[in-house]
Amino acid sequence: MKADNDLYRQLRELPAAQLWNVEVPKFDQLGPKERNQQVALVRAVGVVFTTSRNPEMKAAVKAWMISLLQDPSEKIRRYATAAIPKLGGDEESERKLIDILKTTDVDREKKKVASALEKIGGAATLKAVAGSGEKLIDEQKVRASVARQGGPSNVRLDAIVPKQPGLRLHLRCRKGLESIVADEVREDEGRGGKFRVVEVRGCFVVVEPKDAFTLAELYQLRCFDTAAFSLAFIREPGSAEALEVLAKAIASPLTEKLMLALTQGAARYRLSMVSEGNHDDAVAKVTKKAFELNPRVLNDARESPWSVDVHFDELRALVELRPRISPNPRLYYRTDAVNAASHPPLAACLVRVAGRQDKEIVWDPFCGSGLELIESALAGGVGQIVGTDIDPAAIAIAEANFKAAKLTGTKAAFHTADFRDIIRIPELDRGKVSLVISNPPLGRRVRVPNMHGLFTDLFKIASEVLRPNGRLVFINPLRLSSVDPTLRLESSRTVDLGGYDCRLEVYRKR
């Protein structure tokens, strides 16, 4: 085995052309014993050509692998079997693998063939499984493979979810932002929105639909991170019965009804245990049991449009059905991002906390890709946005994002500049800016020298440019407050930004 691995590593380093034009012909001319000794070549070729962008070359490699399925050596057949799914299965490879499954007496070859058929199998594999009662092949995986072959599946934003008693959704967010998310829902309800706040909990807000709705209507709300349908609460998630309860929740009529109604293409889900540790064994048991209970609800970890998320706390687990929506319809304007860019819902939360004034002039001193500025303009009432950043690449991205947002009623100016050089920025007249808003460098993903000095200067400059009653709204990673008497701290809340706490603060200019 060690010799095979050493040879494989050597062959992996060779150019693809040399592997195919030199090493493969040499391998084909060898006798049975020598071919077995050089079997690592089959593995190397399979891996190297998996990413080939030459369709003719890839097809030729796959044809060679299929021919090896008839080799007298079980080891060579097994290596070729492992390579075929990486190259893309077809009816010919499926047929030959089924033939091997029916004829071989070697257990490890049976297992390898079964694994390959689970990845590329189609109707012929399903028929073979049904006819033979073959237990090595996971029927659910084959059905998922067949579904993928039928084309991509997507969550439909325009599909109507009928009103039904007891239906709840969880709007998840970063810890500390729950009240902002809830306030947005309540305000939207006051304008005729379709959702009502039921409960505010740690990291999520429970809402119920007041009427039939679409996900497009839900995604008009901008402050939540992800949305999911509540499926079940599991008490004592560590108990032996917990996996059974979880499987029943996945296989339930509610899950099936939601997935079928809201999916274009085959409805499939992946199961995610949102906690530390390895949960592979539990996931396998639950998805198998759920399929036994309801074979119309398919598990597919590879390309599923839905995720069943299990969130744990000390006493229970929450089971949610989350649509995997990509791209996010709220970020239609996001053409690109920068390193350490703002978390988009956090930008929307900053804007909401800031409130609105007439004819706003909004400045982000560290604008990055421009999310806070664009979210401010989307909220309305903004006449001018100004973005500064020392990185010219960030400024280019911010300009492109603003253009994509199509905010024709708002003027925009972006400058590659240090925020302290306000004299170079004509749009920043002293005492004219109504809102300074930013998620500034926090010193985590991007190192920032003299953080204390940076934020001291931010307070000073904000005081200079803000008009009376103007606001400074930002994320503060330091235990540092303004000493400027013209800036009054109006609110401060602790927010978890991925393992470390910061403060979302609002200062108002006297």
Question: What is each of the regions a protein language model found here?
Answer:
Residues 268-270, 307, 411-413:
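Residues at or immediately flanking beta-strands
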